[in-house]
Amino acid sequence: MIMSKRSFLTLSGAALAFAVARPAWAQAMKVAIVMPGNITDKSWTQSGYEGILQAKEKLGIEIAYSEKVVQADQAEAMADYARRGYNVVIGHGGEFQDAASRVASRYPDTLFVVNNGQEGGDNIASADFNFRQFGYLMGYVAGKMTKTGKAGWIGGQKIKFSLDLNSSYEEGFKAAGGQEVLTAYTNDWDDIAKGKEAALNQISQGADVIFPTMDNAVIGSLQACKEKGVWAFGLYYDAIVDWPETVLQSAIFDIKGAMLTYLQLAIDGKLEGKNYNFDLSTPEAARLGTFNPAVPKEVQDEVLALAEKMKSGELKP
């Protein structure tokens, strides 16, 4: 989730003009979110849904949402909310970046935000995470826990989120003494059967620690790991709660916290047309999960020390 990005932002002239031009809303702001998957997927889409509900409760906004919106329909779904007078329209996933770019100029009075996006400008903002920090730390744990010297990593598609997580996971794995990372893409974020098949294939090749990074398809990968008795990592939430015998640690990309931050800025008239990046220094939005008791205390301490070095800037995966 990752990147060597700007850490809470460089202000461009265009972004400044965008922020200054936006007055604070005197009445309830209307916010809509368009999501790619199912709101009960215990993964990325559910986190976005919970984020908009939390924002409604804490910020007093009026909300609407659409789920299971395929990529071909994303631009029209975002445009429809803009036509209906929503002040902020959120595309929940990096794949919405193109859709936001296509419709934003037609609705200059609407603010478009892309969760897990990388770009901003005019009336488009984006929010993402330093995925590389977390990929490295999960990889380091894997390198300390593997018995075969092989780990697995599974992604949905080859987008920046995936590429950054994959490469940093391999970097951390090898830094901890691991030898080889097997990489696979399902080309489907939500197909549970494909997630399970990919994990089983890696396990058959000797991987004994696997990091699945899709959306709903992660469930299939975790099922495979549980059935075969190999370790795995969680994503987006503290997955050890649901997989206590399988998950070693989790990379928590808490989009709920990020959404609260940028929607408060929008209410105050201060949301800028730029990228907002969250990392270990912003634990309300990005943090480690709970260590499985199987992870030795010395390994836990090493990982936490690495995290501190990342916060200070001494270590940049």
Describe each PLM feature range:
Residues 27-317:
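A residue-level marker of the well-folded mature domains of exported/periplasmic proteins
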Residues 1-25:
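N-terminal secretory signal peptides and thylakoid transit peptides that target proteins
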